[in-house]
């Protein structure tokens, strides 16, 4: 009860900040990949993966080379990001556990201060915190492989839904188009790519098994190479949707006043990677872009944690960080 009262009190302090004047605070677009290793982009050191849009984003912004997650598993990592707390503090530290309704997220603070807050794509945070957003367009996860090897719906192993919806990104641009134009935007855009299952034929020019870069701890077999090639294909598909978002921001003439952050929730879904404490499991790509504010084509070796994301977004919005946040 005390936590609930504290949350209500905090939001009541923010509400008076609203006014009828034009709100020129920056838009914030947060893009989160699903099971992408930190070094599997062209701009982070893997020239074998085709990621032209993310490479351009990095060239126009800053890449952090020492960015780490609090945990190397999907939903606990996301819960940690949205609450700026460590997994053992979220009560959602296990895979598929929902965030409890009494957890404070940075999103409701942005919303209370006047931001239009939306989420599109993979959700994976439970039903209790959906109301922190003005709108949530959750991706269809039919055929999405769970750790048991079963699909996410009805226990059947099926293919992902047809077409662009396989990526989880098909509603990214539509939800941006639907925003009210008189409010600053916060968008949580979450992909299903490059999470398993993998489908062949998703690209006109797929990556070739003989061209992939295998880590030294992976057996160099044709099976491994084919698996990595399909993983690369999903990264390239994700990159295409990132490009679509950038194009839409330009179309709406808000790109210059939009802060973009791109990360992954954990490492690649291969042995010794995801669910481990190796860099390939818990380290993340971390690319920021904000024209006229972030030095283009720059790198930082500063140590960054995913719990720092929420305080950074709040600072961009001119808001204070709650004391219960760890970042």
Question: PLM ranges: what are they?
Answer:
Residues 2-4, 18-327:
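Formylglycine-dependent sulfatase
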Residues 5-16:
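Bacterial N-terminal signal peptides
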């Amino acid at each position: 009860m005390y936590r609930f009262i504290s949350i209500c009190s905090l939001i009541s302090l923010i509400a008076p900040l609203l006014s009828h004047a034009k709100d020129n605070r920056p838009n914030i677009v947060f893009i989160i990949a699903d099971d992408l290793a930190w070094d599997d982009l062209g701009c982070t050191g893997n020239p074998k993966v085709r990621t032209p849009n993310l490479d351009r984003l990095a060239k126009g912004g800053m890449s952090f080379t020492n960015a780490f997650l609090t945990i190397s598993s999907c939903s606990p990592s996301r819960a940690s990001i949205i609450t700026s707390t460590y997994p053992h503090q979220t009560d959602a530290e296990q895979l598929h556990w929902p965030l409890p309704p009494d957890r404070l997220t940075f999103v409701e603070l942005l919303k209370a201060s006047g931001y239009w807050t939306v989420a599109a794509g993979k959700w994976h945070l439970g039903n209790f915190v959906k109301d922190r957003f003005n709108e949530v367009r959750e991706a269809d996860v039919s055929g999405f492989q769970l750790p048991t090897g079963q699909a996410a719906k009805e226990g059947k192993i099926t293919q992902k839904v047809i077409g662009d919806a396989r990526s989880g990104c098909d509603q990214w641009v539509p939800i941006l188009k639907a925003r009210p134009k008189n409010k600053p935007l916060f968008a949580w855009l979450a992909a299903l790519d490059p999470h398993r299952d993998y489908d062949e034929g998703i690209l006109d020019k797929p990556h070739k098994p003989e061209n992939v870069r295998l880590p030294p701890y992976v057996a160099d077999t044709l099976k491994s190479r084919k698996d990595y090639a399909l993983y690369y294909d999903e990264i390239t598909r994700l990159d295409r949707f990132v490009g679509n978002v950038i194009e839409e921001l330009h179309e709406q003439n808000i790109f210059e006043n939009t802060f973009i952050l791109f990360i992954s929730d954990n490492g690649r879904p291969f042995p010794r990677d995801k669910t481990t404490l190796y860099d390939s499991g818990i380290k993340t790509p971390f690319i920021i872009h904000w024209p006229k504010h972030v030095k283009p084509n720059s790198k930082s070796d500063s140590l960054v944690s995913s719990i720092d994301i929420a305080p950074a977004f709040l600072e961009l919005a001119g808001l204070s960080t709650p004391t219960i946040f760890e970042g």
